Structures are given as C-alpha cells and as structure tokens.
Amino acid sequence: MQTTAQKRELAEKQEKGLSVKSILIVAVLIAAGAVLKIFSNTIFSFTPLKPNMVIAMYCLAIMLLRPRVVEAAVIGLISGIICMFLPGATPYANIVSELVGAVVICLLAKLPYRLEVKGLSFKVAIDTFLATLCSGYTFFLMLKVLILTGMELSGMAIDVFTAVIFGTAAINSVIAFLLYPVLKKVLVRE
C-alpha cells in the first residue's frame, strides 16, 4: 500500500510534462507528416490548395501520448512553425491553425465516448477528422484575414476550400485509424 508521501511524489512526477521519449515520438511523427506533406504537395502541384498530413501526425502523437492541453498547444505551435517552412506555405496561417487543431484533438481525446464496430475503435478516426476540420477552417479564416482581406470570395472558391478541407480530414482520419493501433502496440511493448 502506498503512503501519502509516495502518492504525492507520484503526482509530482506526472505533472512535470512530456518525457524525452514522448518528445522524440512527437518529433518523429511530425517529421513524417512533413515528408508526407512535401510528397502530397508534389502530387497536388497543379492545385492551389494542398492537403496537410502534418495534422494527422500530431493528432496521432496527441492521441497516443495524452499530453496536457498546454503541451498539446506547444505541439501545435511547433507543427505550425514547421509547416511554415515547407514548400507552398502561407506565412503565419499554419501557426494558428495547427495550434487550434492540436488543442481540439487534445480535448477530444479526453472525451470518454467510445465508438466501436466489431472490436474496431473509430474514436481516433472521428477525433482526427474533427480536429482536421477545425484546423482547416481556422487556416481558411486566417487566409481570409491575412491575404484575402477585402476580397470577395465566390461560392466556388469556398466550395473548393471546403472540398480540400474535408478531403484532407478524410485522408488524415484514415491515416490515424490505420497507424494508431500499430503505434500503440509498439509503445506499450517498450
């Protein structure tokens, strides 16, 4: 049985933040997302809008590691800064949109709902989809504020943005759905 002092020591250890191992996991996943984003940018080079796979990777990192909201916000800020240096970036828009997306996925991860079909959990896919939508629409809002201020956007332009945002959300949710169980098993083994 644990004494009160041992419980207090355990609580203090838990409040210190992400471990070095967790930070390395976040770094590797965000780097993989950056590579996927560069790769997808070459595939979609003919379009003005491109999907962002960094979102899927920070969603995976946050769902796997369950950081506090502040730590998730830092993960989002770092992801946004990295996105700014990738080809085809819109200055500053990614910083805000990835911050929002990371905080949203962190809050969604804390919700106690479960959605399973024949033993397969769809929570990660749904949470990633919703976080990507929040990030995408925040990016769109930032784009409107930073670049398109005063410009009238046609219905078709908004439809294109919406299609890219929902398409990216679908791709990211599939990536998260497929990789989450594998990564979770690897992390549990260690």
Regions picked out by a protein language model, each given a short descriptive name:
Residues K37-K50, I78-A109:
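Interfacial aromatic-anchored transmembrane helix boundaries in multi-pass membrane proteins
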Residues Y92, V117-E190:
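Membrane-embedded alpha-helical hairpins and interfacial helices in multi-pass inner-membrane proteins
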Residues Q2-Q14, S22-V28, V35, I75, ...:
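Short helix-perturbing small/polar motifs within transmembrane alpha-helices
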Residues L29-G33, E71-C83:
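Small-polar-interrupted transmembrane alpha-helices in polytopic inner-membrane proteins
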Residues P51-A61, P91-N94, L130-C134:
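Alpha-helical transmembrane segments of integral membrane proteins, especially early/N-terminal helices
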Residues S40-S45, L65-P67, L86-P91, Y113, ...:
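Short helix-capping/hinge motifs at transmembrane helix termini and TM-loop junctions
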Residues A61-I75:
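Membrane-helix interface "capping/anchor" motifs
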Residues Q2-L65:
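Hydrophobic transmembrane alpha-helices
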